[in-house]
């Protein structure tokens, strides 16, 4: 299965002050953001979100972004993912409640926009079975995984049977400069894919 995802942009707006201004009475959007980030992670850790639910703050910008100034606004994104769309939407309701609660308690203005949304995609069990058999013929016992990243297959999944074949990244690292896969695993993945495609082309089509 490929996870559904929702991407939101949030802006907390407060009041800009000099860094030497008294702490009392500030309307500091950076402090609001920090509180939200902590509470969102705690919500997941304490079971308020499913264990396989992910929420990520991927972009963050302060304005005016000056070291001696309390920012006037903080803009950030929240990306959420889960394979089950109703679970995804319920999780977002809980996170959105936190977003609004922090803004209200700190006297911050709030802008919230959903930037994108995609539904979860169920991969083809038949294609997966072809992959499994091809891997086992190469002496590998494959693992069945859910995919958090969307992949191009998500765009095709509603029209044709799709499957995903993964080769392991060293230490599980992905989407970072340290991402790497051992050459022998790359070769094995290519062989398994070749075997699977030959099987599908030869009559194993789901």
Show the residue positions of the predicted features.
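Midchain, well-structured core segments that form catalytic/ion-binding scaffolds
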Residues: 1-86
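Predominant activation on well-ordered alpha-helical scaffold segments within soluble catalytic domains
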Residues: 7-10, 30-41, 96, 132, ...
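Short, low-order "capping/linker" segments at domain edges
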Residues: 120-138, 163
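Zn-dependent metallopeptidase/amidohydrolase metal-coordination segment
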Residues: 142-192
């Amino acid at each position: 299965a490929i996870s559904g995802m929702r991407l939101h942009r949030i802006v907390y707006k407060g009041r800009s002050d000099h860094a030497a201004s008294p702490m009392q009475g500030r309307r500091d959007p950076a402090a609001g953001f920090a509180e939200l980030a902590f509470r969102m992670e705690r919500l997941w850790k304490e079971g308020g979100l499913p264990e396989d639910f992910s929420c990520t703050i991927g972009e963050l910008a302060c304005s005016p972004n000056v070291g001696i100034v309390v920012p006037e606004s903080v803009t950030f994104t929240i990306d959420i993912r889960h394979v089950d769309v109703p679970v995804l939407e319920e999780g977002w309701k809980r996170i959105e409640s936190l977003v609004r609660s922090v803004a209200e308690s700190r006297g911050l203005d709030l802008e919230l926009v959903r930037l994108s949304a995609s539904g979860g995609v169920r991969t083809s069990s038949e294609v997966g079975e072809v992959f499994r058999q091809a891997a086992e013929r190469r002496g590998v016992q494959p693992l069945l995984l859910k995919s958090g990243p969307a992949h191009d297959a998500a765009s095709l999944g509603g029209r044709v049977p799709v499957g995903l074949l993964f080769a392991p990244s060293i230490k599980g690292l992905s989407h970072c400069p340290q991402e790497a896969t051992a050459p022998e695993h790359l070769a094995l993945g290519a062989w398994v894919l070749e075997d699977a495609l030959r099987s599908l082309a030869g009559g194993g089509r789901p």
